[in-house]
Regions:
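Hydrophobic, membrane-interfacing alpha helices
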Residues: 2-298
């Protein structure tokens, strides 16, 4: 039955296995996973680009603040992403314990939660973790929180771009069944040709949003309007993820939830992002811009 449906959807689909992709680089003593490498390169790029932006007039913080900030942000994205996935996306069904329901016999969360190499990271959890890290550093060093977010968020889409490309290389998080010419058959996807939704996400929330934010920072005076860059990032990320969820196959353990509510878990979690981003952008545009000579604590 499934094979007949696959044949009707795509007469000559692309087979992911024919691409010769591997999940990592074999270094002999261990395999460097592309997903881990994507996180590493994303953090390095964001740090490098933020340091470059801080050399421009009107920066909200000094380099020493950025050094501390990216240490805490790295912890925030890893811990927040993992805890967010366990809390919102598992229900204990994938080997990653739910932070709310799957406790060990002695009352503590299972150590399986720490097995990052098994996969499972939530964008929304990572976003909350990074936001908490930025808030802590801004509060501790008496920095303008929203302007710190403005600068940090510009480089974030690079990490999203690389992360989604890594998902594609791993053959995971594929999309819904499709008859488009570029539809692909992924391992474990019931031999159905599907949308390569990882590439859609890489293009929308990665490349497109990165270009928009870079142009706003380097070619306009957006950085002198506190909250504008942060709002555009939040709004753009929310819209990109909401749209892409229509092409992405819902998580198996949440398929019933999506069927009952009409939207996926990712879309429900994204709606507050869209609303928040829109409000922040409107407020940023209503206020007069800062003077070019505005400086931050050294």
């Amino acid at each position: 039955m499934l094979s007949l449906l696959a044949a009707s959807l795509a007469a000559d689909p692309i087979y992911w296995t024919d691409l010769g992709l591997r999940p990592g680089i074999d270094l002999g003593f261990f395999t460097l996973r592309y997903y881990s490498l994507a996180y590493l390169i994303g953090v390095i790029f964001a740090y490098w680009h933020t340091s470059k932006m801080l050399k421009q007039p009107g920066a909200p913080m000094a380099q020493r603040h950025a050094d501390d900030l990216f240490f805490y942000c790295t912890l925030g994205v890893i811990l927040g992403g993992r805890l967010g996935y366990a809390a919102f996306y598992t229900g204990g069904a994938t080997g990653i314990p739910s932070a709310f329901t799957d406790f060990s016999g002695d009352g503590f969360v299972s150590w399986r939660l720490l097995r990052l190499w098994d996969g499972g990271m939530s964008f929304h959890g990572g976003l909350l973790g990074v936001t908490a890290a930025m808030f802590y550093v801004a509060w501790r060093d008496k920095l303008n929180f929203i302007r710190v977010v403005d600068y940090v968020c510009v480089g974030v889409p690079m990490g999203m771009l690389l992360g989604r490309l890594a998902n594609f290389v791993n053959g995971e998080l594929w999309g819904r069944a499709s008859d488009m010419p570029w539809a692909m058959v992924f391992p474990g996807a019931d031999d159905l040709a599907r949308h390569p939704s990882q590439l859609y996400q890489a293009g929308l929330e990665g490349l497109a949003l990165l270009v928009i934010l870079l142009l706003l920072f380097w070619k306009t005076r957006a950085r002198y309007r506190p909250g504008l860059l942060a709002g555009v990032f939040t709004l753009g990320m929310g819209i990109s993820r909401f749209v892409n969820e229509f092409f992405r196959q819902p998580d198996a353990q949440l398929a019933d939830f999506a069927a009952r509510t009409g939207l996926s878990m990712g879309q429900w979690l994204t709606l507050p992002l869209i609303l928040t981003g829109l409000i922040v952008v409107l407020f940023a545009l209503r206020k007069p811009p800062l003077a070019s000579g505005t400086t931050a604590p050294a």
